[in-house]
From Swiss-Prot:
GO MF term set: metal ion binding; ubiquinol-cytochrome-c reductase activity
Gene label: MT-CYB
The protein's name: Cytochrome b
Membrane topology according to the record: Multi-pass membrane protein
Main location: mitochondrion
Cystine connections: none
The organism of origin for this protein: Condylura cristata
Length: 379
């Protein structure tokens, strides 16, 4: 008799995705982040659900409701900080997952990659709206600054901003709709992640060598289930350490001050995971130019398959490209640092140079390095 997991319509899908899935025998721990992102998403949806049971999306009571969750709800402080720091872990995994894709040429799976880029945008939108909900100073002013960027769009900009606000400023209508969107988007992200996996399983996983692994496949379970569980344990260990020892390490103290439209904080800045994009935005002394650079800083990922000039898929055997890749990583860390600094000398010029370098490496230097490496192969 055939095993039920191979015949039952529902269990067959799970079996073909997580149990009998043929996987390359040589994928490293850099391939763990897909499953870790799944764990992060489930964690965020669950903690978010319990937070939504006690949260009120009204400007008068939002801040108080978050205080109530932390003080009066059973383990409310734990749920709240797991959710806030879970977002940070989510983005750490996202950045490492995307970096892995860039390094090993995973972007050659075009459908999988493009859905991944859409997922990144959706996650960033969700995180931004979530940051507005506690209705602290940085929530309010962050929402004001970022939504205001849309006014840079010619002709329709101002109308668009007022339409999103639901009035002439960030107010009750804005908070209510942001809560609604923040609730629904993670489920859209989950659906997109399913499509992401669907397209990935059409081709099979890439591997560090960038070569076809069709001749050497192993079942996903038990090999990679066990390997993924180790990753999950490390993730949970880091997250619980963060939540229990320094829950406010990555937050902004200004967000413990209730939102006040009459008082602007000295330094308006987003959460740490947006600082690199924020630094690029601020580097251009023109509103529309800055917004375009901000969008392109992420959208540029969609153009990577077109910029791939190498004869090899992975960077494993391409030392010049490797060098440029790690310079790009250092550049992104520099941009993250600059994004959190005030707009004054020398930070302005450092940010501008780092922004130029970011686009130059991806658009010019990496394709050129690949061509050089192709020619070196002929020697």
């Amino acid at each position: 008799m055939t095993n039920i997991r191979k015949t039952h319509p529902l269990m067959k899908i799970i079996n073909d995705s997580f149990i009998d899935l043929p996987a390359p025998s040589n994928i490293s721990s850099w391939w763990n982040f897909g499953s870790l992102l799944g764990v992060c998403l489930i964690l965020q949806i669950l903690t978010g659900l319990f937070l939504a049971m006690h949260y009120t999306s009204d400007t008068m009571t939002a801040f108080s409701s978050v205080t109530h969750i932390c003080r009066d709800v059973n383990y409310g402080w734990l749920i709240r900080y797991m959710h806030a720091n879970g977002a940070s872990m989510f983005f750490i995994c996202l950045f490492l997952h995307v970096g892995r894709g860039m390094y090993y040429g995973s972007y050659m799976f075009m459908e999988t990659w493009n859905i991944g880029v859409i997922l990144l945008f959706a996650t960033m939108a969700t995180a931004f709206m979530g940051y507005v909900l506690p209705w602290g100073q940085m929530s309010f002013w962050g929402a004001t600054v970022i939504t205001n960027l849309l006014s840079a769009i010619p002709y329709i900009g101002t109308d668009l901003v007022e339409w999103i606000w639901g009035g002439f400023s960030v107010d009750k209508a804005t908070l209510t709709r942001f809560f609604a969107f923040h609730f629904i988007l993670p489920f859209i992200i989950a659906a997109l992640a399913g499509v992401h996996l669907l397209f990935l399983h059409e081709t099979g996983s890439n591997n560090p060598s960038g070569l076809s692994s069709d001749s050497d496949k192993i079942p996903f379970h038990p090999y990679y289930t066990i390997k993924d569980i180790l990753g999950v344990l490390i993730l949970i260990m880091i997250l619980t350490s963060l939540v229990l020892f320094s829950p406010d390490l990555l937050g902004d103290p200004d967000n413990y001050i209730p939102a006040n439209p009459l008082n602007t904080p000295p330094h308006i800045k987003p959460e740490w995971y947006f600082l690199f994009a924020y630094a690029i935005l601020r580097s251009i002394p023109n509103k529309l130019g800055g917004v375009l650079a901000l969008v392109m800083s992420i959208l540029i990922l969609a153009f990577l398959p077109l910029l791939h000039t190498a004869k090899q898929r992975s960077m494993m055997f391409r030392p010049i490209s490797q060098c440029l890749f790690w310079i790009l990583v250092a550049d992104l860390l520099t941009l993250t640092w600059i994004g959190g600094q005030p707009v004054e000398h020398p930070f302005i010029i450092i940010g501008q140079l780092a922004s130029i370098l970011y686009f130059t490496i991806i658009l010019v230097l990496m394709p050129l390095a690949s061509i050089v490496e192709n020619n070196l192969l002929k020697w």
